[in-house]
């Protein structure tokens, strides 16, 4: 695929599937990438070079920045680790009883949140760092998203739980996904009013947190990431969702290798990018919304791997025309 000034591939990509891409808290320059190749990598996307790589004992399933010089990660070895970019040091913070699937930082509550296949969410105090509580979930945690001081957790069995991070004594809301199939990804609106949820069956739901009936009336779901081939519809998992912090619009990435940008409030697709080499595994907008990181890798959902499986992270400069709601 030809590179354009608006889009290029990162040099030194991971050697195996990318599990997560995350931009630094205040930058469109630093990108954290976790991978099944047992590394966490830090890239400078402006100069297109890999600044640091932290080798791990097992595949890494998620990562996040805490601030501009520290990051966290977790994966199949069940250990939450923290990295200091200035000293190039790494330390273990604590453990789950099964692989860690999700790692997020909540700035409003100043906690690191991990979700695991052991059916718990744990909170970690980044100041010490140490465990600040363990909270049972109804099933394996597949995805979670921080929404202000609330936490939205998606588990197996299509369960959705809304927690208040300032008071984890009880679950604030228990919901069931409005999509019929397994939940793949949840991300919350930057305006904190709701969240977007995707499933393995080419659908996305836009949900609102306010339980009042008039607000709940606004929720809806739509089909996407489906391709007609020889009169048959092929339906693909929607693996990734990323929000534009400025415009409240969002991108979705599917196993069809396509990235779409949506205006969730006006129920419109704003644009669709060209097809990428393989499935879209993860997406992240920079804080100012000027750059979108797109991880493309083979995700073993098709029966046969392609002849060439290419792991790549594309950096795309996006503009208002692609990401801003049409007035």
Q: Could you tell me what each predicted segment is?
A:
Residues 1-327:
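WD40-repeat beta-propeller superdomains and closely related acidic/aromatic-rich repeat-like regions
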